[in-house]
């Protein structure tokens, strides 16, 4: 088992709340271990969305490659499945370059999906049923659609915000297709052994200090 672990490819995870200091630490870490970055942020992937996303500035990158930043236009869709695909492509480029990937960000669901290679079973979809759910939401509102999810999968309903209609529909769609709650499916996937030899760092700080840094960052963005 120990020998098998050693043969796995290395992966570093660096996460934590906004303004805790991930960017600065990630750069120093990359210099120390010959690392390259993969952003696990659901908004920094978009171009033209610098304000409010705390996106790293080009001068801060210090010539260290950063993947999944400024690669999509705002009207393009981005979800955990697309993140997983793009992040795996970035991983292969980093490993080929002889470097160590450092996944940085605050979207924990995305990180777990990559770390444990979660299968979201997105291949089959019933367009008719999806359209029916979308029409229901248009007529009755997102809260009513979310209530339908709660009736069949309370755990998913607790985890998914009513306004995240795409994920609500996907959860209902999955239950309709398989008779299994997507929360149960995902939990099973999370119990899989990771294909990576990873270390997982979660940064934290006093709340007041984080809030002060957030205020300072907003002021800088708006100057």
Where would I find each of the regions flagged by the language model?
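Phosphate/pyrophosphate-binding catalytic cores of soluble transferases and nucleic-acid-acting enzymes
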Residues: 1-223
